[in-house]
């Protein structure tokens, strides 16, 4: 796994992680769909910020470039300093916020354990953002 955090805004020991998206509507990035769509990028970035920078993760959002969509993701409902540019259903109470971060960490640990155990199953529907295998000549996945 690899990734690059686009932006981290900090204030008073807290951090808001921002991931810019181009060409996509970010409504599909609402926190309510993260588990169903196995979408843990922003949560993982928040964990990295906590661990490496020693800051409290106060939110992780996907921001559209060149569109007027509202940022989507998750923000801590107890942090007013983030402003009001977020949908109410992306604001989570502290225990739910932490549970999403724990879920993301569990996903990464589970993937790591499977890879270390030699399990490299193919899943063409999840392979590329629009479905379909990215490397059909080497994938060996049977249709």
Please give the residue ranges for each predicted region.
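RecB-family 4Fe-4S metal-dependent nuclease core
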Residues: 1-143
């Amino acid at each position: 796994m690899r990734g690059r955090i686009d932006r981290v805004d900090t204030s008073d020991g807290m951090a808001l992680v921002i991931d810019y998206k181009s060409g996509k509507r970010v409504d599909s990035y609402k926190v309510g769909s993260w588990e169903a769509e196995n979408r843990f990028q922003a949560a993982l970035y928040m964990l990295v910020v906590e661990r490496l920078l020693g800051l409290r993760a106060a939110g992780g959002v996907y921001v559209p470039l060149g569109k007027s969509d509202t940022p989507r993701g998750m923000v801590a409902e107890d942090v007013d300093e983030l402003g009001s540019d977020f949908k109410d259903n992306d604001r989570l109470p502290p225990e739910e916020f932490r549970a999403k971060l724990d879920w993301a960490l569990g996903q990464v640990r589970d993937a790591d354990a499977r890879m270390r155990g030699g399990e490299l199953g193919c899943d063409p529907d999840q392979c590329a953002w629009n479905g379909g295998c990215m490397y059909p000549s080497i994938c060996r996945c049977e249709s």
